[in-house]
C-alpha cells in the first residue's frame, strides 16, 4: 500500500475507488525510528569547495566580460553609459530629479583617458593574477552532525601580539563652563572691542555679526543677503544659528528700540523674545529685521514669497557708497603737513571725484558687472583709445575744469597718457626709407622710429633701447661732422699763401718796356670795346664824392677813391688807413666748397692760423691801373697807352669785367680782337648785370677753350660778402669798407671750378652784385610778356624758369593760364627737357585750382602747398639760366614761410602778413593794367589764342551776322579779361550781363 512520509509520519494513499464507498477515519500509522530514512550530510573536502568557488567565479567573470565586450564594441552605448556615469543629479524646476549631463567633449576625453590608463596598467603589472577564492565553510554544531570542525590553520600558525594604542587625552578648553557661557564671553569681547564675528553654518551659509551703538545701548546686527543685492526667501536659518542669536540677545539691550525707530539702515538688527516687536511680528523666539510690508516688520528668519512686497531696510545707497569711499580714501591718503579745512562744498567735491573716476574707468554704472567685464576684455590699446574718445566727447566739461589751476597737472597727466601717435604718415615715410637696409645706423633708426610710433604705449625696455641707439648714432655723427657740421669747421684751415703767384706773361722781357711795365700793344687798342661801352669815365676835376658809395641791389660799399686826395698832414694821412667795418661774419659752412667729400681750398675763404676767417682791410686806391693778384702782394699794371690819360670805373653790375681785363693780359696780341669781340657780343649779353659767380666762371671757361693761355691768368682781388651773398671784384680804387671775407682763388683755373655742378658750395650762387633787382626785372618782363606772345615765346625759349616767378601772385598765374602760355611751354619743352615740361604741367594744374578759389588767402595757401614739389623738381634741373636762382630762392622762401606759419598757427599765433599780401596783389594788378594800357585793342585780341575759349566760357558763340553786337561783346570781354581777375564769380556774372 502506497504511503507518503512527512517527517516521521507515514500517510497511506487510498485508492480512488475505495474513497467513494469506504468510510475513512483519522488513522495515523506511527513508523518506527528504525524505518525512517536519515539524510546524512555529505562530507566533501576543502579542495572541492575551492574548485567550485573558482568555477563559479570564472563563470561570473565570463558573463561580465561578455557584457563588457558588448558595451565596448558599441561606441554609442559606451558613450551613453559614460555620460550617465558622469552626470550629476539635480532638482528640476517642478521638483523632479533630473540628470545634469556633461558636455560631449568632456565625455570623449574621459573615454580616451580610461583607454590609456588600462593600456598602461597591462604593461606595468603583467605579473598580477586576479583570482578569487571563495571559502564556504558550513559549520554545524556537534550536536547536529556529530562531526568536529576541521581547522584551516597551518602548522606554522602563530598568533601575533596585540599592540596597545596610546590614548591621547585632549585638553578640555572649556573646563568650568558650558558652550553658552563660551559664546557669551566671546560676544562680549567682540562687543567691547568692536570686532566683527563670522558665523558659519552649513555649506555656504555664513553671516557677519557686528555691534551698533543705538541710544547708548549695543544692538547686534547680522549681514543679510539683500544687502549684497541677492534676494532669497529665507535669508537666515534659525535652525543653524538659533543658539547664536539667543546668545546675541543675552549680551545686548534692545529695550530702547521702538517701532518708529525701525527705518532704512536697520536691516539685520537682532531682537530677543522678550521684545514687544518680536512678540508682535515673529513666530520664532528671535526677530532679525529684514524690512516692512503691508502687515508690518518682516522677519529674515521666516520665508517671504514675494520680494517686491517687502521694503528692505538695508542702508541707503549713498550711505553705502560713502562708507566704501571713506574707507579706501583714508587708506590711500598721503601724509599731511598741514591742518585740513573745509574750503569746498560737497557737491563740488563729488563732481571732481566723478570726473576723475570716469576719466580712468568710464562705465555707465559702477555697480554693473557687465560694464566692468567689458573694460576687462579689451586690450590696453583699445582701452586707451576709449579714454581718448571719452576725453574728446566731453571736451566742454574738461575745459570748465581747466579754469581751476589746481587741476593742471592732473589734466596733463590724463591727456598725455591717452594721447596716441597721430602723425603716422611721417613714421611710415621713415620706415620706407630705412627698410631693407641692414646697416647698423639704419637699424638704429628703425628702433628709434618704432619707439616713437608707439607714443605713450612704449614700454620702458623699448624706451631704453631707443635711447641707447640714439646715443650710439650721436657718437657716430659727432665723429663724422667734418662733412657738414660746424664742429668740423673748427679744424678747417685755409691759410693764405706766403708766396706770390708767378705770371709768365709779366716776366717775359719782350712784353715789358724799359721801365719794366707791361706793354699792351694790340691788346690795348682792342680793349676800347670794353672801356667805351661798359665803363664810366671818372673826371677828377668834378671830384670823387659821387663815386665813393658803390651801390648794389643788396646794399652799398664805399670805395677808397676819396683817398686819392692825399693830405700832407701826417695825422690826417693816417686816418686814410682806417676803414668802415661791416658786421663780421664767423666761419660757417657757406665759406667752404666741397667735392666728393673733400675741401676745394682754392674755392674757400681764407682763414688765419687759429681757424678764424681772414677779414679784409682797407684797399688803397691808385690811378689808371689794373690791379691783379689775389694772394700775396698785388701787382699793378698800367692801363693801355691810349687810355693812360683817363680814369675809368666799371658801371654798376659790370664789375666782373675786371676779370676779363686781367685775362686779356695773357691773350696773344693777334687774338685780342677775337677775344674782346666775344666778350662784347656774346658773353656780356648772356651775363647781363650782376650775374652769379657760377655764370662768370662758366664764361671764363668758354674763353679758356678759345684762348687756353688765359687759364693761368691772375685774378683781381675778390671779397666775399656773406650777409648780402655778393662777390665784390676790387678794382684800382680799392675799398674803404672792411670786414669782408677773402676768396682764395688766384687764377682763372681756380675760378673755373665754380662752374662745376658737382661742386657743393653756396658761394657759386652768389651774385657779382645782387639778386633782388634781377628778380624784379624778371618779374616785369614776365608781366610784360603775358599779353605779348612774341616776347613770351622768347622768354620760354631762352629762360623757361621765369614762369615760376608768376607764383608771387595768383593774378599772374590766372592770366598766363587764360593766354595758354603753360600749354605752349609744355609743347616746347616736353621733348627737350622732361623735368622742365613737368614744371609747366604742375603750374597749369595749380592755376586751375587757384581759379576756382575766391579768397586770396586760400589761393596763396594752394601756391605754398605746391612749392615743395616744384622745389624738388628744380633741384634736378640745369641751372644755366639766369632765372634759375631767383626761382629757386622764391620757392625756398615759400616753403620755409609755410613751415614757419604752420608752427605759429598750431601754437595759436595769427599770420600778420595778410595786409602785406593784399597790398602786393593790388600793386601787381596795377602793373598788369599799366602794361596792358600800352597795347592796342586789336593787338590784345588778335594775338590771344585763348579768345575762343573765353567766349565759350562766358556765353554762346558770337553771332557773325551782327557786327555791332560782336564789337560790343568783344570789347566787354577784353576789358574784363585784361583788367580784372576772371577767376571770381563776380567777374563771371559781370561778363554775362555785358554779353546780354
UniProtKB/Swiss-Prot annotation:
Residues 647-769 form the Peptidase C6 domain. Residues 173-313 form the Peptidase S30 domain. InterPro entries: HC-pro, HC_PRO_CPD_dom, HC_PRO_CPD_sf, Pept_S30_P1_potyvir, Potyvirid-P3. Keywords: Host cell junction, Host-virus interaction, Hydrolase, Inhibition of host innate immune response by virus, Protease, Serine protease, Suppressor of RNA silencing, Transport, Viral immunoevasion, Viral movement protein. It holds the Pfam family Peptidase_S30. It comes from Zucchini yellow mosaic virus (strain Reunion Island). The active site is at 226 (for p1 proteinase activity), 235 (for p1 proteinase activity), 267 (for p1 proteinase activity), 655 (for helper component proteinase activity), 728 (for helper component proteinase activity). A motif (Involved in interaction with stylet and aphid transmission) lies at residues 365-368. Its EC number is 3.4.21.-, 3.4.22.45. One of its GO terms (biological process) is viral translational frameshifting. The keyword Transport applies. Potyviral RNA is expressed as two polyproteins which undergo post-translational proteolytic processing. Genome polyprotein is processed by NIa-pro, P1 and HC-pro proteinases resulting in the production of at least ten individual proteins. P3N-PIPO is cleaved by P1 and HC-pro proteinases resulting in the production of three individual proteins. The P1 proteinase and the HC-pro cleave only their respective C-termini autocatalytically. GO terms for cellular component: host cell plasmodesma. The N-terminus of helper component proteinase is involved in interaction with stylets. The central part is involved in interaction with virions and the C-terminus is involved in cell-to cell movement of the virus. The keyword Hydrolase applies. GO terms for molecular function: cysteine-type endopeptidase activity; serine-type peptidase activity. It is an enzyme of class 3 (hydrolase). A motif (Involved in virions binding and aphid transmission) lies at residues 621-623. The record marks 313-314, 769-770 as: Cleavage. It comes from the Viruses. Belongs to the potyviridae P3N-PIPO polyprotein family. This is P3N-PIPO polyprotein. Coiled coil: none annotated. Transmembrane segments: none annotated.
